[in-house]
Curated annotation (Swiss-Prot):
NCBIfam families: cyt_tran_rel, PRK05627.1-2, PRK05627.1-3, PRK05627.1-5, PRK05627.1-6, ribF. CDD domains: FAD_synthetase_N. GO terms for biological process: FAD biosynthetic process; FMN biosynthetic process; riboflavin biosynthetic process; riboflavin metabolic process. It comes from Haemophilus influenzae (strain ATCC 51907 / DSM 11121 / KW20 / Rd). This is Bifunctional riboflavin kinase/FMN adenylyltransferase. PANTHER family: RIBOFLAVIN KINASE (PTHR22749:SF6), RIBOFLAVIN KINASE/FMN ADENYLYLTRANSFERASE (PTHR22749). Belongs to the RibF family. GO terms for molecular function: ATP binding; FMN adenylyltransferase activity; riboflavin kinase activity. The keyword Kinase applies. Catalyzes the phosphorylation of riboflavin to FMN followed by the adenylation of FMN to FAD. Pathway: Cofactor biosynthesis; FAD biosynthesis; FAD from FMN: step 1/1; Cofactor biosynthesis; FMN biosynthesis; FMN from riboflavin (ATP route): step 1/1. InterPro entries: Cyt_trans-like, FAD_synthase, Riboflavin_kinase, Riboflavin_kinase_bac, Riboflavin_kinase_bac/euk, Riboflavin_kinase_dom_sf, Rossmann-like_a/b/a_fold. SMART domains: Flavokinase (SM00904). Keywords: ATP-binding, FAD, Flavoprotein, FMN, Kinase, Multifunctional enzyme, Nucleotide-binding, Nucleotidyltransferase, Transferase.
Amino acid sequence: MQLIRGLHNANRVLQGCALTIGNFDGVHLGHQTVLRHLRQKADELNLPMAVLLFESQPREYFMGKNAPARLMRLRDKIYYLEKAKVDVVIVAKFDRTFAEQLADVFIEQTLVNHLHVKFLSIGDDFKFGSKRQGNFAMLQAASKRFGFIVEDNRSFCLDAQRISSTAIREALANDDLQLAENLLGKPYRIFGRVIHGNKLGRTIGFPTANIRLHRQVNPIKGVYAVKVRLKSGEIFNGVANMGKRPTINGLMQLLEVHLFDFSQNIYGQMVEVEFCHKIRNEIKFPSFDDLKVQIEKDVETAKAFFNS
């Protein structure tokens, strides 16, 4: 798969494509269905299959710190898009210039001149251009003028529930990990690099692997039973805390994982943390000793979950 950063670079690579556009946050079951269909159409038309992503995501640009939490960072999206057999991912910078671009300019400059689109699969509720004035009807009209095919990719449902990134965020916020997994088509996971921390956990008998988070707004908070996959492919059970660590007056979001029966040095490694079961919410304890007692209980709860 080829990754292209910046629309200006796409013009040198693409001479026609079957394209879809979106955030693809979570690359959930609905996204996966769209991608399978687009793969089929690209093969039928003998075109490369392309996905256009925006960075930052539009709502992050407009809403700033009030934007919804991401389900996954860009690097992880690209990983799952490659698994879906996408040929080309174009990452376009979403900034003021792009946000103020007129809808007809987006069609002619971005879709036609830069991406040379021949087939476009897009939601019929897709809005684009300054003040969201562009819509599916405008794309249909433009397709006749510029000679490309456009079709709508409808919403997909699971047990009458629309599959969407918003629905998955709500499931995670409600501690319904099973529903989130059903909508995602995979367990909810976070990927990150193990970094050095203040090593307070080892002073109370619970050393932790601290996972760097590239965002301070996350869709989950609290203490969880987790599975951690290392670079080697080994999988270890553990207990994790996602939060600001109020007992030590922490200010930044951090993912801390205590692995059971583990003694390896994994500093600097990329690891995959799969969230299996919510144990409790994050609490500020009166003392470090009280925290230690609770962690002992959390470990027993997690071990009981994995043994059940």
